[in-house]
Structure formats: structure tokens, C-alpha cells
Amino acid sequence: MQKNFEEYPKYLFHEGTNIEADKLFCPKKAVIDGKKGWIFRVWAPNARDVSLVGDFNGWEVGATPMKKDDGGIWEVFVEGLKVYDAYKYAVTSKKGKTVLKADPYGLHFETTPQTASKLYDLSGYKWKDAAWLKSREEKNIYESPMNIYEVHLGSWKRHDDGNVYSYVDLADELVEYVKKMNYTHVEFMPVTEYPFDGSWGYQVTGLFAPTSRYGTPHDFMYLVDKFHKAGIGVILDWVIAHFPKDEHGLSLFDGTPCYEYSDPRKGEHYEWGTKVYDYGKPEVRSFLISAANFWATNYHIDGIRVDAVASMLYLDYCRKDGEWLPNKFGGNYNLEAKEFLQKMNVALLSAHKGFFTVAEESTAYPMITMPPDIGGLGFNFKWNMGWMNDTLSYIETDPFFRKEVHNKLTFALTYAYSENYILPLSHDEVVHGKHSLIDKIPVSYEDKFEGLKTYLGFMMTHPGKKLLFMGGEFGQFIEWRFDQGLDWLLLAYPRHKGMLEYTKDLNAFYKSTPALWSQDNRWEGFRWVSVDDNTQNVISYLRYDKSGDYVLVVLNFSPVPRKRYLMGVPELTSYKCVFSSTMKKYGGNSSYKAEYKAEKKSMHGLPFAIAVNIPGNSITIYKPENN
């Protein structure tokens, strides 16, 4: 059965270097000896028997037996099948137990609570994003704006009857909204197939399939295509740190630990109730890297954000003494996971120019975004969880007491250039009793809005790329709920409408101001002006682009206005306000753009100064007249 053609891909699969294992294992149409049918393959090296069951044979175990090769790959050719036929593999262990397993390489699935795989033909979609892909190849992502809107597709909006939006619905509405709001990228919380709604997609059973909750694979292609035509990049939340124990999934696939580590001290996340991939097993490496490569190739995805990287890197992650195995050197690093991540990043970034990878890594593990050839993991970006935790703690503090925690606002600059960072205000920060972004701010109703505007302004002008979870842009008050849409009705209220308008304009200002993104990864792009005025809750800094043009950013995290506040500046010229959170259109109390003439008075280590009036709870951005 096409043996000569398949032998080399099988060799690479068993070697751990086949990054297109989908071409070997995903069911596909074929013509053999003049007969039309579908080829199925599945890796189950320790199974006693495997047969294909489905609609076509009444789900009768053994009716369509598969043949095993020397490497543990079972295969069969079946005539008379059609797209959308449901199927599973009936895998019989050496102990004689038969379990019906979904296809690890399945392209489409039944909608939960059903769990069967479904035949699908990915061919036929006519992409219209060639211009986007070409521009992506030519872009330097480190010196370009990156402002990400994080979305859970099932709860961004819902129909009046409570039903979810389809991929096609989202292509009609979400794309237009993200473009109107001036974001550069959208990040989908996991869309790879998963059985349990309450996992938010983080317990994956189908790494090669967009969830059928919202439509077909072609529908998902259409959604990505629409984003690209609108000039928006698409990032997937990518879950390869663990997988669920659902019987139809990967757990004990052939009756033995096949995809997971055999020792539960490495192979189980007790706290999450899930299994851990065996990153040292060649076939598992081929499977995982092929999955990411598959989405980049077939769905034109622009990047992946790898979830829970810390849990992959540390053998003692969320484990007590005696519950974990040290590595060969006696340490707590998972050396196999490190090597796997390095190989994954090299493979993906080599195969897809302009594609990028992001690590959600919550510790101080070194060199996450450094090249593998010097010992790094090879990611393009890392989430800056330290910045997020510190600054959220700061805004949760009453303004009167913020002087005691002023360092939480400024500390991130001591390490801001040690990695290529993304500043994340993600879904994790607006659930489980943590409150929504706006409700974290412990002041009056009116001041909550001004405080959130100030905080978002701080994020957008701080070194690092940006990410904001849906709802934060208009000040959603209640926590995120995965089974309901956002509270769009709030936009009927002026303060929420003003908040949305503010975020839209702030995003536009960021995107049009190279000083705020062209030197995110080097010290030359930043200079503190006022860093330690904790008594007045004021900070200020300069952001520079590569040509030397700059903006002066002034932030007041107190509700008390500051009059004639002396601010050091580099030039003896006029400084004009080019952006302010207190404009009336945003619900503030002023709409003018003030201008200040510099004086020959040194301040903050700079040769000149301006005496500015700083509104309470505000961000104000100035440009020198000669810019």
C-alpha cells in the first residue's frame, strides 16, 4: 500500500524529525488498484489489535481490521466512504481490553458531547491572503507594532437565543470590530478540538482540528482569511503541556503509556488531573511539531502562544517532594522538554517566514527568547508575567497607599530587555474571584474609569508588545463567563462608550507612533524622567524611535491633580499634548491640547524642564514641536 512512498516519512516519524506527520496519518482520499477510498493510519505500537469502526460498518469492532507494520503503525484502505462519515479506532490492548479511540490526527470531529472523528477533505478552499503573507515575510516583528486582542470565540458575542456565533458569524462581525479598534493581531483561546466546555479549550483531544462547535475546517479558514484581508494577524493559544484523561483521547492510547510518560511522577499533572506528553519520545515529538506546522501550513496561522511552558520545563511543577523525578543531573529541569521546545521553534521558524512563537512562562527561567544555538529556547516572545502581577497589584492598591508599593510600577524596567516581552492582561486575570480589570481599581465608580484609562495608557507606552483580553476595552464590570457573551449592553452608557472610544484611539496612537514600538527590545528606546516620586504617584519617561524622535509620557496614578509639576526634557522647545485620557470625548473633563515651553532649568538629569499641569488619574503624552 504505497509502501515505497511512505517508508521515508515513517523513518522520520520514528526519528522524531517528521514535521509533516499529518501527511502520513491524517485520513486522506486515495486510488489503489483503480479503487477509490480512504487510507487510515494510526500509531499504536503496543496494541494487540486495531480495527476501524464507524458509520460505514455499524461500529462493529473487528469488521474492518487494520494491519500493523514493524514500527507499530496500523493501516487500512476502505472504499465507499464520504466526507463527514464518523469513525474511531477500536484499539485492543495486550490484556484484551478494547477501547474506541478518536483519531489523534483527525481533521474534524463530532460536536460535544459526541466524540467521534469525522472524515474531511481540506482541499478546495481558495485563499485570498497572498498579499498578507508576503507582507508578513518582509516584516521585522520586533520593530513593528504588536497589539493583540485576546478572544474566546464562544463568549465574545452570542445570538439572542444564547447560541454561539459560528466561524462565519465571527468573520462577519469580529473581524470588523478588531479592525475598527485598531488592533494588529487577534489571539484565539484554544480552538483545537476539546470535549469539555468548562476547560475553555485547554484540555485538547484533537490537535489537528478546529473545534466543530463553531463550524467546519473550511469555515475556520474563511475566518482567518477575513482577518488577513483586514490586515490582522492570527495567533493560536497552543496547548501541548498536557492532555486530558478522557477515554476516547490520547491517554493510554494502546493500553499503555503511548503519548505520555510512563512514570506518573513525570506523566501526570495531579493538580490539573491531566497527563503530560513524553517529550523525549521521537514519535510524540513528530506528532506535536507536525500539529503546529499543520496549522501554519493549512490554516495560515501567523503565530502560536504556547500555554503553561513553566509546567513543561520544571519536573517539580506543582508537585510535592516524592512526587517528581529529578533529571540525570539531579536537577528539576525537564531536559527533554527543553530540547523539544528548541527543536519545535527551529522547525517552525525555519519553515514559515514571518511566523512567530510566544511562551507563556511564569518563572525566571533564563533565555526563553534567545536562539537555541546559544542555549536559549528559541521563542520570539515571552509573556511578562512579572510586569502583569506587579502592576495589577499596584492598581488594586488604594491610591493613598500606592506610595508604599511604588516599586511595583517601576521594577519591570530593571529586566525589560532581558527577553523579548509581551505585556499580557489576559483572561486569567478576570476570573475566579480576581474581578474584572475595571473592578480591580478600589475607588469611586467615576474614578474606576479614569484609573483604567491610565493603566491601559501605561501598558501601551511601556516597552513590550501588548495583549488585552476582550471586555477590558470597554470596562466590563463582571468577571468573564465562558458560557455567556460579553455585556455589550453597557455601551448604552456614556462612560463605557467613552472607555471604548478611548481604547480605540489609544490603539491608533500606539500604532502610528514608532517611538512606542520600534525599539521595544533595546535600552535606546527608553529613558526614565521621573521614576521615584512615590509621594505624588507620578511617573514619566521618554520613548524614542530609531531616528531619535521621541514622546514624553506623563502618568498620574492619584486622583489629585498636580499643578506646575517640573518635568525634565531634552530640548529647549515647545512640547505639545498629542494624547490625553482626560478629553471630554472619553468621558473626561478637558478637551484642550495644552502646550508648554521648555525653560533653561535642569531637572531629572535633563538640561531643560517644563512646568506641566497633570490631571488626576491620567496619562498625557507630549511631543516636542520639532517632531
Residue ranges and their predicted role:
Residues 113, 300-302, 317-483, 490, ...:
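Conserved alpha/beta catalytic core and glycan-binding cleft of carbohydrate-active enzymes
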Residues 42, 89, 151, 178, ...:
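Conserved, mostly hydrophobic/aromatic
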Residues 1-39, 67-150, 155-162, 169, ...:
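The feature marks proteins involved in alpha-glucan
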Residues 110, 130-143, 152-332, 612:
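Substrate-binding/active-site clefts of carbohydrate-active enzymes
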Residues 43-50, 570-573:
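Short proline/glycine-enriched turn/loop motifs at strand-loop junctions of beta-rich domains
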Residues 83-87, 592-627:
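C-terminal beta-strand-rich structural cap/linker in extracellular carbohydrate-active enzymes
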Residues 495-516:
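Catalytic cores of secreted or luminal carbohydrate-active enzymes
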